[in-house]
From Swiss-Prot:
<keyword id="KW-0479">Metal-binding</keyword>
<dbReference type="GO" id="GO:0008616">
    <property type="term" value="P:queuosine biosynthetic process"/>
</dbReference>
<comment type="pathway">
    <text>Purine metabolism; 7-cyano-7-deazaguanine biosynthesis.</text>
</comment>
<keyword id="KW-0436">Ligase</keyword>
<keyword id="KW-0067">ATP-binding</keyword>
<dbReference type="InterPro" id="IPR018317">
    <property type="entry name" value="QueC"/>
</dbReference>
<dbReference type="Pfam" id="PF06508">
    <property type="entry name" value="QueC"/>
</dbReference>
<feature type="binding site">
    <location>
        <position position="191"/>
    </location>
    <ligand>
        <name>Zn(2+)</name>
    </ligand>
</feature>
<dbReference type="GO" id="GO:0008270">
    <property type="term" value="F:zinc ion binding"/>
</dbReference>
<keyword id="KW-0671">Queuosine biosynthesis</keyword>
<dbReference type="GO" id="GO:0016879">
    <property type="term" value="F:ligase activity, forming carbon-nitrogen bonds"/>
</dbReference>
<keyword id="KW-0862">Zinc</keyword>
<feature type="binding site">
    <location>
        <position position="205"/>
    </location>
    <ligand>
        <name>Zn(2+)</name>
    </ligand>
</feature>
<dbReference type="GO" id="GO:0005524">
    <property type="term" value="F:ATP binding"/>
</dbReference>
<protein>
    <recommendedName>
        <fullName>7-cyano-7-deazaguanine synthase</fullName>
        <ecNumber>6.3.4.20</ecNumber>
    </recommendedName>
</protein>
<feature type="binding site">
    <location>
        <begin position="7"/>
        <end position="17"/>
    </location>
    <ligand>
        <name>ATP</name>
    </ligand>
</feature>
<feature type="binding site">
    <location>
        <position position="199"/>
    </location>
    <ligand>
        <name>Zn(2+)</name>
    </ligand>
</feature>
Amino acid sequence: MKAVILLSGGLDSSTVLYQAKADGCECYAISFDYQQRHLRELDSAKKIADTVGVIEHHIVSFDLRSWGGSALTDSQIDLPSDRDLEEMSQNIPITYVPARNTIFLSFALAYAEVVNASRVYIGVNALDYSGYPDCRPDYILAMQEVFRLGTRQGREGEAIAIVAPLIEMKKTEIIQLGNSLGVPWEKTWSCYAGGEKPCGICDSCKLRLTAFQELGLTDPLM
């Protein structure tokens, strides 16, 4: 069984790649250089892909800085920092990149059709904070319908399935799953700031660090 895995190099997507491997899939990884502030994550994506031994790893390049609209694609917009979970959950954060998962899933779908994969794995998660609209179960269900209606495979046979194993999991549960699968956390990257070391105060760092602390574990990146 072949599967395409959306791989950013972060904690969630790395766990999903390891889960796909554990599910017995032949893994094809796809990552994206969209000129994000935290381009450093692609180094981690390459390392994680190598540890699993994926069949192929494609890095697709396009520039979302041309219209900005997010703190991750516009350096003039400050990253939110040092917020607690309650603050993060109040509004869609400025780190939301408009339609990003729709763009990513479209590329993954095309790639899956080409390599004749039956699954696309994505590491979206809806529980830790209600920030991103394209990380919710109803969004994944809607995109599954796109996969069914918009592809040759969907019209002539069985549609490529979107697999989102982390969608209803807390960050602590994701770390526990990753530990059981042997994910090398030291090779992953979560920080939005884009430096050589994690900033420790952006939303992504805070969520990650808090989860490790709740489990009584040390984050090897901090």
